């Protein structure tokens, strides 16, 4: 793949129909294509799941952002709404793993994630761009959601280049002007970098990048019937990206009993109390904070 010249940038909003910031940014950009114009860059915007956006629902039948496993994309027996929509997007933006596009997938979260880039691979191009963005925008954090021997199923996994942008906290189904504008700025900073690459320039970069590497997901306490038995502990609520040490409070049961983190080392939880993850059995994702040096 030629990383000295980005063929096309694709910005996807509304992959989840109740995440309105990405949807309305894409609508805005599509109304006036001059907004994203860079002389050496071609940028297109599209809505990931138009039907779900119309209904202001995360999805119609299943989570679109878990439908991009290669075998599933090739399996024409899978005919639920999002499984079909994934094949449409794959046709437009793929083929998965070999696409020359740079993909930005816009999301929002009810968790206190600030501005997060979610990387789904280790491509040096993405790490360099992430370092550039954290340097120019110190609010930006970088989360790498890779798991050994496990294929990623996100929209953003269609292309080697690019990532998802996850912003929060924001309730589902609404807009917040502050996060809307911060996301828009981040998109412009990304395009500025890509424009420099296409002009043949090498934007100056910091030598290291701080990233939060995915470790594992943690479920809520449950009864033997699988019913919720507790909530995020008030001392943990909203503390995404803050260190959680062994013995720190993590959940509060409905009987007012505090449950403590029983791991053996410090972790950095994120996606704490994300509304869409209750059905997935995810109360938070644990990460390890690390500094990596850039080559
Ligand atoms: Zn989302």
From Swiss-Prot:
The answer on whether this UniProt entry bears the keyword Transport reads no
What's the protein called, per UniProt? Probable aspartoacylase
Q: Which GO terms describe its molecular function?
A: aspartoacylase activity; hydrolase activity, acting on ester bonds; zinc ion binding
Question: Is the keyword Hydrolase assigned to this protein?
Answer: yes
| Family matches, as Pfam families | AstE_AspA_cat, AstE_AspA_hybrid
Cofactor binding mode and count:
Binds 1 zinc ion per subunit.
The catalytic activity, as recorded, is:
an N-acyl-L-aspartate + H2O = a carboxylate + L-aspartate
The domain of life for this entry's organism is: Bacteria
């Amino acid at each position: 793949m030629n990383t000295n010249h980005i063929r096309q940038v694709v910005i996807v909003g509304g992959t989840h129909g109740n995440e309105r910031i990405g949807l309305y940014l894409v609508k805005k950009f599509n109304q006036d294509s001059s907004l994203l114009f860079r002389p050496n860059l071609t940028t297109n915007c599209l809505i990931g799941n138009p039907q779900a956006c119309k209904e202001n629902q995360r999805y119609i039948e299943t989570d679109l952002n878990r439908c991009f496993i290669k075998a599933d994309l090739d399996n024409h027996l899978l005919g639920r709404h999002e499984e079909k929509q994934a094949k449409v997007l794959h046709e437009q933006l793929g083929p998965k793993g070999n696409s020359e596009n740079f993909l930005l997938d816009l999301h929002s979260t009810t968790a206190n994630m600030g501005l997060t880039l979610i990387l789904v691979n280790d491509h040096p191009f993405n790490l360099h761009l992430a370092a550039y963005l954290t340097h120019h925008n110190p609010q930006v954090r970088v989360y790498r959601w890779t798991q050994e021997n496990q294929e990623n199923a996100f929209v953003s996994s269609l292309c080697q280049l690019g990532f998802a942008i996850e912003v929060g906290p924001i309730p589902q189904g609404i807009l917040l002007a502050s996060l809307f504008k911060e996301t828009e700025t981040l998109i412009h900073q990304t395009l500025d970098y890509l424009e420099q690459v296409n002009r043949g320039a090498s934007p100056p970069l910091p030598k290291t990048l701080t990233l939060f590497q995915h470790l594992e997901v943690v479920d809520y306490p449950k009864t033997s019937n699988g019913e919720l038995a507790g909530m995020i502990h008030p001392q943990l609520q909203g503390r995404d990206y803050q260190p959680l040490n062994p013995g720190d409070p993590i959940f509060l049961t409905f009987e007012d009993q505090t449950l403590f983190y029983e791991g053996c080392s410090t972790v950095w939880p994120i996606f704490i109390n994300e509304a869409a993850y209750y059905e997935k059995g995810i109360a938070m994702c644990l990460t390890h904070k690390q500094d990596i040096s850039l080559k």
